[in-house]
Amino acid sequence: MAVPKKRTSKSKKKIRETVWREKANQARIKAFSLAQSILTGRSKSFYYTTTEKDSNLSE
């Protein structure tokens, strides 16, 4: 016969949610830092291509 599982306590649920939020926050900070370094031109380890718009292409 099936037996219902015990409930997860509020404190354990809150701890898990806090850990998840902290991981998301760290990813946000890292992405923002990378974006800043790219925009300021100080990035030495990230390569990207830039496209220049020609006036001939739009005509």
Curated annotation (Swiss-Prot):
State the source organism's domain of life: Eukaryota
Which keywords accompany this UniProt record?
Answer: Chloroplast, Plastid, Ribonucleoprotein, Ribosomal protein
Biological process per Gene Ontology, one example term? translation
GO MF annotation, one: structural constituent of ribosome
Where it sits in the cell: the answer is: Plastid, Chloroplast
Q: Which InterPro entries match?
A: Ribosomal_bL32, Ribosomal_bL32_plant/cyanobact, Ribosomal_zn-bd
User: Under which name does UniProt file this protein?
Assistant: Large ribosomal subunit protein bL32c
Which gene underlies this protein? rpl32
